[in-house]
Curated annotation (Swiss-Prot):
It holds the Pfam family Urease_gamma. It catalyses: urea + 2 H2O + H(+) = hydrogencarbonate + 2 NH4(+). Keywords: Cytoplasm, Hydrolase. Its EC number is 3.5.1.5. It comes from the Bacteria. The gene is ureA. This is Urease subunit gamma. It is found in: Cytoplasm. Pathway: Nitrogen metabolism; urea degradation; CO(2) and NH(3) from urea (urease route): step 1/1. One of its GO terms (cellular component) is cytoplasm.
Length: 100
């Protein structure tokens, strides 16, 4: 199987998010890279499902809460940005302060 660098990046995000979700299911609090992976995967999959940029910008703030992540992670995570593929093309999705 041959993947482009872009496809490799998305596969890595998906795998990292899956690993982070399994850790969260075991009761562990997520670190910064794990939190970014989970939120980014949510945005990529939402775009694939046909949701709008505006919907994803709102729902991206509901993926994780302060209780899901290690202390200090919400303060380190100001924005999450990803270029997601929508039915009408690729668009940049930005979620400001994703962990309220």
């Amino acid at each position: 199987m041959r993947l482009t660098p872009h496809e490799q990046d998305r596969l890595l995000i998906s795998y990292a998010a899956d690993l982070a979700r399994r850790r969260r299911a075991r009761g562990l609090r997520l670190n910064h890279p794990e939190a970014v992976a989970v939120i980014t995967d949510h945005l990529l999959e939402g775009a694939r499902d046909g949701r709008t940029v505006a919907e994803l910008m709102v729902s991206g703030r509901d993926v994780l809460g302060r209780d899901d992540v290690m202390e200090g992670v919400p303060e380190m995570l100001h924005d999450v940005q990803v270029e997601a593929t929508f039915p009408d093309g690729t668009k940049l999705v930005t979620v400001h302060h994703p962990i309220p």
